[in-house]
């Protein structure tokens, strides 16, 4: 229990990616470039899937929302992180910290579910191509995406409420570059068993549950591809899901390393911070590249968009 006489924490201090003063400006420039590329890439995907009529399919509808989620996830983290590289006292208020944690949880949970939906979409497209447009209808897509955001929001509210229901009255130094569950609970001066349990169950349920959907979908996809007689047909079928397979492997590998571990009262180590950098900033930057460079439809749509844009400027 928390002691009777204490001063309640009103602000937190973030240690950041590195405490070395000489690295602050170089790190600022590196992460500024990362965030800039993330913004450009994901906004590009959102724009292309919105304006190009050939990309108005369920596959690209889900990709559009994945790009939106990636954009939101990095925006919750990056701006504050960049500011902290330039200031000596890296403080964040209690409510600002709670808002950042809630926003991060909303987007990361939504991304986990969205990747599972995209795997199911690829499963139907390859295993049941004749029924694809009937099964994965526009109405169903809207419903699934809406439920994804609703579930992400509900999870964020519940988990962040439990994390901030405990007392913070001793140290206020968060060993991280943003407000996250594990380093926050390590600072609490009250019993953290319940919030730690909620965090662990939520993370394990979301990651393992969605991972099962992904694995089952791709197991059936592989079986269907192996049944295709021609090598050209197998190559074409594989190419439709290769980008998503790569994105899923990178994302789940990093997330499993980070979150599916026994409860601990210890704050994050350097490896955990690097994993956090990877899935909050690097993966949102990589996804547009993965889905565009390995996708003929997206590359063709980009060429059409740039051609039309250049033509519009010439006729002005």
Swiss-Prot record:
PROSITE patterns given in the database record: G_PROTEIN_RECEP_F1_1, G_PROTEIN_RECEP_F1_2
Q: Which cysteines are joined by disulfide bonds?
A: 97-189
From the UniProt annotation, give the residues forming the signal peptide: none
Kindly report every residue range on the membrane side named Cytoplasmic.
47-54, 121-139, 218-237, 294-316
> What transmembrane ranges does the database entry give?
26-46, 55-75, 100-120, 140-160, 198-217, 238-258, 273-293
Taxonomy, superkingdom? Eukaryota
Q: Which residues are glycosylated?
A: 5
Protein's UniProt keywords contain Transmembrane: yes
Q: Where are the Extracellular topological domains? A: 1-25, 76-99, 161-197, 259-272
| One Pfam family matching this protein | 7tm_4
Alphabetical GO CC annotations of the entry are: plasma membrane
**Gene Ontology terms, MF aspect:** G protein-coupled receptor activity; olfactory receptor activity
Q: Which UniProt keywords apply?
A: Cell membrane, Disulfide bond, G-protein coupled receptor, Glycoprotein, Membrane, Olfaction, Receptor, Sensory transduction, Transducer, Transmembrane, Transmembrane helix
Specify where it is mainly localized: membrane
Return the similarity comment.
Belongs to the G-protein coupled receptor 1 family.
Which PANTHER family did the record assign? Answer: OLFACTORY RECEPTOR
By what name is this protein known?
Olfactory receptor 8J1
Give the species this sequence originates from.
Answer: Homo sapiens (Human)
**Lineage, uppermost ranks:** Eukaryota, Metazoa, Chordata, Craniata, Vertebrata
């Amino acid at each position: 229990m928390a002691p009777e006489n204490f001063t309640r924490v009103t602000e937190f201090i973030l240690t950041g990616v590195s405490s070395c003063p000489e690295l602050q400006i170089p790190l600022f420039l590196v992460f500024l470039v990362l965030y800039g590329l993330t913004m450009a890439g994901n906004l590009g995907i959102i724009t292309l899937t919105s304006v190009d009529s050939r990309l108005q399919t369920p596959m690209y509808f889900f990709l559009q929302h994945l790009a939106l989620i990636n954009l939101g996830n990095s925006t919750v983290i990056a701006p504050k992180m960049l500011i902290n590289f330039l200031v000596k006292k890296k403080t964040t208020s209690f409510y600002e910290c709670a808002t950042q944690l809630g926003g991060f949880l909303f987007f990361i949970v939504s991304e986990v579910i969205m990747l599972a939906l995209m795997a199911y979409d690829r499963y139907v497209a390859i295993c049941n191509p004749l029924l694809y447009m009937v099964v994965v209808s526009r109405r169903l897509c809207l419903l699934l995406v809406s439920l994804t955001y609703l579930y992400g929001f509900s999870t964020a509210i519940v988990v962040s409420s439990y994390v901030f229901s405990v007392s913070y009255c001793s140290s206020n130094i968060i060993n991280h570059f943003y407000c996250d569950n594990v380093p926050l609970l390590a600072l609490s001066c009250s019993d953290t068993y319940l919030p730690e349990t909620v965090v662990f169950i939520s993370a394990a349920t979301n990651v393992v549950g969605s991972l099962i959907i992904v694995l089952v979908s791709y197991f059936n996809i592989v079986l269907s591809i192996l049944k295709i007689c021609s090598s050209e047909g197998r190559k074409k079928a594989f190419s439709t899901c290769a980008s998503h397979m790569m994105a899923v492997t990178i994302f789940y590998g990093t997330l499993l390393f980070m979150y599916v571990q026994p409860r601990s009262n210890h704050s994050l180590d350097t490896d955990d911070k690097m994993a956090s950098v990877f899935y909050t900033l690097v993966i949102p930057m990589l996804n547009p590249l993965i889905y565009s460079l390995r996708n003929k439809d997206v590359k063709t749509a980009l060429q059409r968009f740039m051609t039309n844009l250049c033509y519009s400027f010439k006729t002005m």
